[in-house]
UniProtKB/Swiss-Prot annotation:
<dbReference type="GO" id="GO:0003723">
    <property type="term" value="F:RNA binding"/>
</dbReference>
<feature type="binding site">
    <location>
        <position position="351"/>
    </location>
    <ligand>
        <name>RNA</name>
    </ligand>
</feature>
<dbReference type="Pfam" id="PF00973">
    <property type="entry name" value="Paramyxo_ncap"/>
</dbReference>
<feature type="region of interest" description="Disordered">
    <location>
        <begin position="418"/>
        <end position="492"/>
    </location>
</feature>
<feature type="region of interest" description="RNA packaging and organization of the helical nucleocapsid">
    <location>
        <begin position="1"/>
        <end position="375"/>
    </location>
</feature>
<keyword id="KW-1139">Helical capsid protein</keyword>
<keyword id="KW-0543">Viral nucleoprotein</keyword>
<dbReference type="GO" id="GO:0019013">
    <property type="term" value="C:viral nucleocapsid"/>
</dbReference>
<dbReference type="GO" id="GO:0019029">
    <property type="term" value="C:helical viral capsid"/>
</dbReference>
<feature type="binding site">
    <location>
        <position position="180"/>
    </location>
    <ligand>
        <name>RNA</name>
    </ligand>
</feature>
<dbReference type="GO" id="GO:0005198">
    <property type="term" value="F:structural molecule activity"/>
</dbReference>
<feature type="binding site">
    <location>
        <position position="195"/>
    </location>
    <ligand>
        <name>RNA</name>
    </ligand>
</feature>
<dbReference type="GO" id="GO:1990904">
    <property type="term" value="C:ribonucleoprotein complex"/>
</dbReference>
<feature type="binding site">
    <location>
        <position position="260"/>
    </location>
    <ligand>
        <name>RNA</name>
    </ligand>
</feature>
<keyword id="KW-0167">Capsid protein</keyword>
<dbReference type="GO" id="GO:0039579">
    <property type="term" value="P:symbiont-mediated suppression of host ISG15-protein conjugation"/>
</dbReference>
<keyword id="KW-0687">Ribonucleoprotein</keyword>
Length: 525
């Protein structure tokens, strides 16, 4: 049997092992797409600011093709370094694209004010064609996506400090797009705006240089569909992290935004470790979790083998990302989600709609948190040198804090997962302050009642006005039997919630033609 267990552990390690280079050693190269990337040909701030102005206009052109937009974004992302050309050549190793660097200098003869540097050849017309945003036939200027403040005519500056602040304001918005461009592009606008407000308050960016929605949507879509652009952005992040000593201000800002980008798409794996394993609840000893705990251990080893690119595996479309899906450990994931929604209010908005989601293990996680509230881990207590008296004091304080937290009932966590809660039995004494019993009070208010619900969510044969007095009477009896002031406060709050519930049911009864289903999120949000 011991040999079998050793073989099983070895099998799991080899199964989830990262592939190693072997064979002939030749790299597989695809058909490369040529991308032109304009870079400044001198160190003049005027040249850089003028190039940035043209690049922002090109990115806002609704008719720009994908390859050209990728080159524009690569050029824009590398403008903050002293030698953009060297940076691009050093970090670019993409089997799908071939980057052609073109130096750009000032010109008084071209319409764009820029031209391609060359030895004797006149490339003003080529530069005007590249930077042009005019229509191909009429010659009239199209409406391009620009800044929200349309009073901004151009962004050409001559001072280095002004240019750095202007460039930081634009690059911050581009880097913020990467955080959810792959995982949740349709719902990314709200979180992107919150992060923009954060950097505006920190004076890292200038608020009036907020790009309009069309510009941001176009760039976000390009980041989502172009793997080569994402590879460049991840390589740039890793190169900045490896840089020793003090970094440029824009580089530090990129590292700060990276905290939102890192581990994108790996929430199931990371949260399972955080809430399922690190909490160290005794439920981990269940036989049902034995196999999945072994799987998690193998995945953690694989994560470490991938090295510095592991947190970006989803952004880089690494095929190994499927191994980290919650479908590989559904019971442990369901249990961890139950623990999470009880410990953190922010977990209430997480989407649990998965085919492998198990409500029983979700409730197991919830109950472990509730029944373990106020208990002190003996292992951690021994490690920290906590005495038995101190542990008892901590348990008492934690229990009181947990009761107050239940009374407050803040946050959307229970409202989001109310369909998973146990319903109280007929003979059980309800606890008025908890949301589960408040929800269960309406269908289980009296015995012998026809609890079959109509389409609108109301009990048949009963109106909210008839139902509320019975619930109020039960609540009065519960209040009279309790001498604890905290219990009295709970009962008062429960009564208020039940009255609000009755009001909602009355509104639904008035609009009988409306087929909306009663949802307790309207009350508890």
């Amino acid at each position: 049997m011991a040999t079998l267990l050793k073989s099983l552990a070895l099998f799991k390690r080899n199964k989830d092992k990262a592939p190693t280079a072997s064979g002939s050693g030749g790299a597989i190269r695809g058909i490369k797409n040529v991308i032109i990337v304009p870079i400044p040909g001198d160190s003049s701030i005027i040249t850089r600011s003028r190039l940035l102005d043209r690049l922002v206009r090109l990115a806002g052109d609704p008719d720009i093709n994908g390859s050209k937009l990728t080159g524009v974004m690569i050029s824009m992302l590398s403008l903050f370094v002293e030698s953009p050309g060297q940076l691009i050549q050093r970090i670019t190793d993409d089997p799908d694209v071939s980057i052609r660097l073109v130096e750009v200098v000032q010109s008084t003869r071209s319409q764009s004010g820029l031209t391609f540097a060359s030895r004797g050849a006149d490339l003003d017309n080529e530069a005007d064609m590249y930077f042009s945003t005019e229509g191909p036939s009429s010659g009239s200027k199209k409406r391009i996506n620009w800044f929200e403040n349309r009073e901004i005519i151009d962004i050409e500056v001559q001072d280095a400090e002004e240019f750095n602040m202007l460039l930081a304001s634009i690059l911050a918005q581009v880097w913020i797009l990467l955080a959810k461009a792959v995982t949740a592009p349709d719902t990314a606008a709200d979180s992107e705006l919150r992060r923009w407000v954060k950097y505006t308050q920190q004076r890292r960016v200038i608020g009036e240089f907020r790009l309009d929605k069309g510009w941001l949507d176009a760039v976000r879509n390009r980041i989502a569909e172009d793997l080569s652009l994402r590879r460049f952005m991840v390589s740039l992040i890793l190169d900045i992290k490896r840089t020793p000593g003090n970094k440029p201000r824009i580089a530090e800002m990129i590292c700060d935004i990276d905290n939102y980008i890192v581990e994108a798409g790996l929430a199931s794996f990371i949260l399972t470790i955080k809430f399922g394993i690190e909490t160290m609840y005794p439920a981990l000893g269940l036989h049902e979790f034995a196999g999945e705990l072994s799987t998690i251990e193998s995945l953690m080893n694989l994560y470490q083998q991938l090295g510095e690119v592991a947190p970006y595996m989803v952004i880089l479309e690494n095929s190994i990302q499927n191994k980290f899906s919650a479908g590989a450990y559904p019971l442990l994931w369901s249990y961890a989600m139950g623990v999470g929604v009880e410990l953190e209010n922010s977990m209430g908005g997480l989407n649990f709609g998965r085919s492998y989601f198990d409500p029983a293990y979700f409730r197991l996680g919830q109950e472990m948190v509730r029944r373990s509230a106020g208990k002190v881990s003996s292992v951690i207590a021994a490690e920290l040198g906590i005495t038995a008296e101190e542990a008892k004091l901590v348990s008492e304080i934690a229990s009181q804090t947990g009761d107050e937290r239940t009374v407050r009932g803040t946050g959307p966590r229970q409202a989001q997962v109310s369909f998973l809660q146990h319903k109280t039995d007929e003979g059980e004494s309800p606890t008025p302050a908890t949301r589960e019993e408040v929800k269960a009070a309406i269908p289980n208010g009296s015995e012998g009642r026809d609890t079959k619900r109509t389409r609108s969510g109301k009990p048949r044969g009963e109106t909210p006005g008839q139902l509320l007095p019975e619930i109020m009477q039960e609540d009065e009896l519960s209040r009279e039997s309790s001498q604890n002031p905290r219990e009295a406060q709970r009962s008062a709050e429960a009564l208020f919630r039940l009255q609000a519930m009755a009001k909602i049911l009355e509104d639904q009864e008035e609009g009988e033609d409306n087929s909306q289903i009663y949802n307790d999120k309207d009350l508890l949000s």
